[in-house]
């Protein structure tokens, strides 16, 4: 019995790994590059689920990928942060980042209440829009006790909307020729994923890219205090309800902070950093495959339409406000 469980576990790991590798390779192609590997992995898994069904015989490995590997990827994600640069060079952007996060979450929840959409998905989308896309959703979902299906739907929506906006940004820059620093800062503080920021900021040159990454990584840095606020909120909510729930500080958040400190104070060779980045990406992709397998297309259609509309409106408002702010601050 134990050998059967181990075999199921390994087959599940290999299954998610195989689709992750395929998604990683496909994302290197010109057109698919704009979609991103995370979205490709989820779409691939969704199609598999609709056509073939959920592979029950390898569930243990798939469950491991959706839970453990996802948290491991978040821990490694902390190595992208250099707190010295963010607090030193990018303090102006950090102040804007705080406003961006509050604005995104508040507006998303307000709009969702107006159109009576799915609150669980909308709060994940608000966090993903305000902070750092899929990574923020993955990091805060365990704190919020989110369902795996809601996580997968949220990541898919964020990937789609963020990619569309990144392409729109490049078109706007090409047409209106926004000043380099303003454009870089704008992309960094308003686009959803790091990959989307890099895609959009690339057209502005190296100076635009520097400010874009400072703005974006400032939002990643703010994932730490935001997570603490969410933990306190969930504890308060638990104490206020009749059913008491234990809300612990997630170990992966502690790991994320430790990794950020290591990258800030310990020089890491570029070759090693590149290897870690690939491992982080593959772990995240394997987790997205596992989450995508939980999605039933009918549920996506019924649950995702209103949150999709909400996040599009939020993203449009966020883009407009942040462009105005960066134009004033970085003349």
UniProtKB/Swiss-Prot annotation:
It is a multi-pass membrane protein. InterPro entries: UPF0324_pro (IPR018383). The keyword Transmembrane helix applies. GO terms for cellular component: plasma membrane. Disulfide bonds: none annotated. Belongs to the UPF0324 family. The keyword Cell membrane applies. This is UPF0324 membrane protein SERP0111. The chain crosses the membrane at residues 7-26, 31-48, 69-88, 93-115, 122-144, 154-176, 183-205, 249-271, 275-297, 308-330. It holds the Pfam family Cons_hypoth698. Keywords: Cell membrane, Membrane, Transmembrane, Transmembrane helix. It is found in: Cell membrane.
């Amino acid at each position: 019995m134990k050998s059967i469980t181990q075999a199921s576990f390994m087959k599940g790991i290999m299954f998610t790994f195989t689709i992750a590798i395929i998604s990683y390779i496909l994302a290197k192609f010109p057109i698919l590059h704009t979609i991103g590997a995370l979205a490709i992995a989820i779409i691939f898994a969704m199609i598999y689920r609709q056509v073939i069904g959920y592979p029950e015989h390898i569930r243990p490995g798939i469950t491991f990928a959706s839970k453990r590997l996802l948290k491991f990827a978040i821990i490694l994600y902390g190595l992208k942060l250099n707190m010295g640069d963010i607090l030193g060079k990018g303090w102006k952007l950090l102040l804007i980042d705080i406003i961006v996060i509050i604005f995104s979450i508040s507006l998303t929840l307000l709009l969702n209440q107006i159109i009576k959409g799915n609150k669980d998905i909308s709060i994940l989308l608000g966090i993903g829009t305000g902070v750092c896309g899929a990574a923020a959703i993955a990091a805060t979902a365990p704190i919020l006790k989110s369902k795996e299906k809601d996580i997968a739907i949220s990541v898919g929506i964020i990937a789609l909307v963020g990619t569309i906006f990144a392409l729109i940004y490049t078109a706007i820059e090409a047409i209106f020729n926004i000043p380099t620093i303003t454009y870089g800062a704008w992309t960094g503080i308003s686009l959803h994923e790091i990959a989307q920021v890099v895609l959009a900021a690339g057209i502005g040159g190296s100076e635009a890219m520097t400010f874009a990454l400072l703005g974006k990584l400032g939002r990643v840095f703010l994932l730490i205090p935001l997570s603490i606020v969410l933990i306190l909120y969930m504890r308060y909510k638990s104490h206020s309800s009749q059913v008491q729930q234990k809300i612990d500080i997630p170990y992966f958040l502690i790991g994320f902070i430790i990794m950020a400190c290591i990258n800030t104070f310990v020089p890491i060779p570029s070759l090693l950093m590149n290897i870690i980045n690939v491992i982080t990406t593959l772990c995240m992709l394997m987790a997205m495959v596992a989450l995508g397998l939980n999605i039933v297309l009918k549920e996506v259609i019924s649950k995702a339409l209103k949150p999709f509309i909400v996040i599009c409106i939020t993203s449009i408002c966020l883009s407009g406000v942040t462009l105005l702010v960066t134009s004033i601050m970085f003349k």
